[in-house]
Amino acid sequence: MGHRDVATVGLGGPVGSGKTAMVKRLVPRLDAAGYNVGVIANDIMTQEDADRLRESFEGILPPDLVEGVETGACPHTGIREDPSMNIAAIDEFTESYPDLDVVLLESGGDNLAATFNPELADYFIFVISVAEGDDIPRKRGPGVTQADLLVVNKTDLAPHVDADLEVMRRDAETVRGDAPTCFTDCKAEEGIDGVVDHIEEGVLFA
């Protein structure tokens, strides 16, 4: 586990890959499964993602369990080189909510090199979009190769962008070995339960 025995799950990935949409789908499912959840949304200069998430989770999470962190620099700075602001936000959560089970940490949009400091995230999910091209998995990058779970999101767009999901599946297996990959469509809520299963197996039941 991590900070004061609360599990921390980091979600990283390029701009537009669907990280915020994924958080919106994960929180109600984790809540329904009986977990007490907090959310931290990182961005460079704004609180927009945090504000949208807070509105989305009305009636599910108390407003003060959704926090925005403005990194003021490259997105990976706040999750890797200097995670102190995120760690402080987690500590504030656990002081107010000692029964908190898990905190989801959404990174600002970055590139394929984005990873989380292990002092910050117990479990790392890297989200890519089909719209970025079906060659993304084989381009590797630390996010793709080092994540505990790779999520290939926006599968509904595959026929519109000439992306081959089987190619992406094959390439993900080649570059990640036995590490898991999930294919999701957040809009249709497809594949989200599989992501929850991996979170439970990877960190909540660990």
From Swiss-Prot:
Belongs to the SIMIBI class G3E GTPase family. UreG subfamily. Facilitates the functional incorporation of the urease nickel metallocenter. This process requires GTP hydrolysis, probably effectuated by UreG. This is Urease accessory protein UreG. GO terms for biological process: urea catabolic process. HAMAP family: UreG (MF_01389). GO terms for cellular component: cytoplasm. GTP binds at G13, P14, V15, G16, S17, G18, K19, T20. One of its GO terms (molecular function) is nickel cation binding. The gene is ureG. It is found in: Cytoplasm. Homodimer. UreD, UreF and UreG form a complex that acts as a GTP-hydrolysis-dependent molecular chaperone, activating the urease apoprotein by helping to assemble the nickel containing metallocenter of UreC. The UreE protein probably delivers the nickel. InterPro entries: CobW/HypB/UreG_nucleotide-bd, P-loop_NTPase, UreG. Its main location: cytoplasm. It holds the Pfam family cobW. Keywords: Chaperone, Cytoplasm, GTP-binding, Nickel insertion, Nucleotide-binding. It comes from the Archaea.
